[in-house]
C-alpha cells in the first residue's frame, strides 16, 4: 500500500505530460501576412530569392520570417531558432544552394516516419514568401552561433 501512494501522486503529472507530448504534432500552422514582401508567384523557387535583398526590404523580410518562425516552427525547432532536441536546429542550415535545397525539400514534403507526421507539408499552409522569409531570418541568426 505504501508503494501505491507515491504512484498516485505522480499519475496526474505523468498524464498531463503525455498530453503535451501528444499535442506536439497537432499544431495548426498559422497564416502569415506577406503583403509587404516581394511576391514570388506560385511555382516553387529552388534558391532563396530574398538572400541578396538589402535595406528596408531585407528588414521587412527578416521581421516577417522571425514572426512566421515563432508562430509555426518554434514549438518543435526551438525558440529563437535554438533547438531543444526535438527537431533539427535550423540555424545550421547553410546560406547556399545546398541549404536551400534541404529546406525546400523539407517544407514541400514534410517529415513522416512510419506513418506518423512529425512535420506537415508547410507549402500546403504557408506561402512561398512566408517560407523563404523564415529561411532568410534563419540565415540572419546563424552568424550568432
Feature map (PLM): residue ranges:
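Gly/Gly-Pro-rich "capping" loops immediately C-terminal to redox-active cysteine motifs
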Residues: 64, 78-108
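Bacterial N-terminal signal peptides
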Residues: 10-17
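Bacterial N-terminal signal peptides that target proteins for export
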Residues: 1-9
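Electrostatic cytochrome c docking/interface patches
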Residues: 29-67
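Axial heme c-ligation environment in periplasmic c-type cytochrome domains
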Residues: 24-32, 84-91, 109-142
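Short sequence/structural segments immediately N-terminal
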Residues: 68, 143-145
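Extracytoplasmic/secreted proteins, especially bacterial periplasmic and envelope-associated proteins
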Residues: 56-60, 64, 68, 85, ...
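The canonical Cys-X-X-Cys-His
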Residues: 65, 69-79, 119, 134-138
Amino acid at each position: 500500500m505504501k508503494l501505491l501512494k507515491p504512484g498516485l501522486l505522480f499519475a496526474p503529472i505523468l498524464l498531463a505530460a503525455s498530453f503535451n507530448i501528444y499535442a506536439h504534432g497537432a499544431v495548426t500552422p498559422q497564416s502569415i501576412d506577406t503583403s509587404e514582401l516581394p511576391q514570388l508567384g506560385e511555382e516553387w523557387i529552388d534558391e532563396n530569392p530574398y538572400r541578396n535583398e538589402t535595406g528596408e526590404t531585407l528588414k521587412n523580410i527578416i521581421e516577417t520570417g522571425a514572426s512566421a518562425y515563432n508562430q509555426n516552427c518554434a514549438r518543435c525547432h526551438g525558440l529563437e531558432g535554438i533547438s531543444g532536441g526535438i527537431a533539427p536546429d535550423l540555424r545550421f542550415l547553410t546560406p547556399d544552394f545546398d541549404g536551400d535545397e534541404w529546406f525546400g525539400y523539407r517544407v514541400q514534403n514534410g517529415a513522416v516516419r512510419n506513418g506518423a507526421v512529425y512535420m506537415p507539408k508547410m507549402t500546403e499552409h504557408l506561402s512561398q514568401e512566408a517560407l523563404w522569409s523564415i529561411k532568410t531570418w534563419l540565415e540572419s541568426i546563424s552568424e550568432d552561433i
